Amino acid sequence: LTGLLPTPDEVDAFVKDRSLDAYGRLVDRLLASPRYGEHQARLWLDVVRYSDSNGFDWDEFRKQAWRYRDYVIRAFNHDKPFDRFIREQLAGDELLDGPPRTPEEQDQLIATTYLRLGPHDNAAPLFNEQDRSRAELMADLVETTGSAFLGLTLSCCRCHDHKYDPLSQ
């Protein structure tokens, strides 16, 4: 649950604990650990293609990307309902009536960073390829949203009908 091996002392304590609720208490302790949110967030961040940099040739550092990473960790550590977690990432800015006033409202806005996580080619504007760059960004977002939230691979539909799912080009 935390992505970390137990220490020898933790193993000994668990093996020696003969109470009926030993396993449940261990699970509760692991779920309450901040390491739980960090581990689960790492798995989620892989799914949504999180990176601290833009990729491509210039690979510039994204100075504020950590805010999204920390939002995801908090969401797991505070047991945020999954439907809320998804809604905030897809439309967190639309859930607000005005500027964010509370930490929870700030999180809703930070969650929409998901929409900008894909690789970004900073050289495209220099070579007058802004339209292609935007199209690639949108295609990446559609592909990632399909795989993360629908469990579907949509990238093949750019060129041909899907081999297994009822999705056409």
What are these regions (language model features)?
Residues L1-Q169:
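Short, structured secondary-structure elements
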